[in-house]
């Protein structure tokens, strides 16, 4: 059965002077995160952005995909540390998410650096958020701490 997760954004005012509030409706884990255009395209000043939320989704989804793959192979990780950096840029005059750079380090007993890199790449390609971002260049840096 398909799972549906819902977030809501309420925006007031013009795009340049107004602002929005983003809430996780399904889980309720965050409410009223501030978003504005000036902080989206400049200094964050305590506000989030759609791109930061995409980065959070990508990092968390990828860590689950990598953990699942390693566990299926009989080598569950002791720990994984994943970050995703999403780039928002102008392409042909249109604002566009252009890249998501994943960086992962992990401690996985019994796994060589080459095996870790292979598992990391497999997870990058199989992660549902990676697949959702199919039009975005996704790169990966992996480091085995074992």
Task: Mark where each language-model region is.
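Extended beta-strand/beta-hairpin segments
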Residues: 1-56, 63-146
């Amino acid at each position: 059965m398909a799972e549906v997760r819902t977030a809501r954004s309420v925006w007031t005012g013009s795009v340049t002077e107004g602002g929005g509030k983003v809430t996780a409706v399904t889980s309720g884990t965050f409410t009223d995160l501030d978003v504005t255009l000036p902080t989206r395209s400049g200094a964050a000043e305590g506000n989030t952005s759609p791109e930061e939320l995409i980065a959070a989704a990508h990092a968390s989804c990828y860590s689950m995909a990598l953990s699942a793959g390693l566990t299926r192979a009989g080598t569950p990780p002791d720990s994984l540390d994943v970050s995703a950096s999403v780039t928002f840029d102008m392409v042909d005059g249109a604002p566009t998410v252009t890249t998501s750079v994943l960086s992962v380090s992990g401690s996985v007993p019994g796994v060589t650096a080459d095996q870790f890199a292979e598992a990391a790449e497999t997870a990058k390609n199989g992660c549902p958020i990676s697949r959702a971002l199919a039009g975005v260049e996704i790169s990966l840096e992996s480091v085995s701490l074992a």
